[in-house]
Amino acid sequence: MVRRVLAFVDRPCERFEEAAAFWTAVTGTRLSPRRGDDGEFATLLPESGDAWVKIQAVGDGGGAHLDLEVGDVRAAVARAEALGAAVAADHGDWAVLRSREGRAFCLVSGEVPGEVPGEVSVGGTTSARRPPVFAGTRLDQVCLDIAPGAYEEEVAFWAALTGWSPRPGSLPEFTVLAAPGMPVRILLQRLGEGPGRSAHVDLACADPEAARALHERHGAAFVARGRRWIVMRDPAGGIYCLTERDPET
């Protein structure tokens, strides 16, 4: 069973400090102490709620990936393999896998000490508290960019792996996976062309243009305008989107 979904902002090692400064500024968070063998991991810590957004220094490229926090990593790995995933690296209490399309994700066992999520009991069920809206925005979504020929299979894989029911998005090329009490949702996007296997984070914005102005003041750059979103590039070169959605819902 998936207990939490964690969003990782992946940025090149040499741009980590720039990326961390930007993302803490535009989300109203502070950076945790760095951890990992090479100090490659850190968490964006909100004033309240569940710390579910992480940042990772990577060797090249960038983008985003998902970590699924589960109660039993061994059982979760076996289930993922049965659904068609392949293990890329097994570290015992956590593992790196690839989806049927070849998209990397991790299965992990629990929280980092000192970063226990805020939780509330609703009707006897434990659920995570969402971090507060900051400057009219909330980072609440990871978008998986999927090649046209792999789309249906990838949607089925992620729905089965998370146990979340898919529902149509705002446009025909979108499918949403979300669950009550989870601070993050997954958006699966069918690309018009291209290899897929990429991912980026999205922010829900009450006013995307106001959010764009704020982000540009912190060093981001405008890339393109979509039907209901603005594509941006952060100071470390990573792509993300400001989407026209209510950050309170």
Predicted features, each with a name:
Residues 1-20, 64-66, 108-156, 161, ...:
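N-terminal beta-strand motif that seeds the catalytic metal site of vicinal oxygen chelate
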Residues 59-101, 200-239, 244:
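Vicinal oxygen chelate
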Residues 24-26, 70, 85, 113-114, ...:
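General N-terminal targeting signals
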Residues 13, 71, 100-102, 111-112, ...:
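Short loop segments at secondary-structure junctions
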Residues 27-64, 104-111, 164-199, 235, ...:
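Conserved short beta-strand elements that form part of the metal-binding/catalytic scaffold
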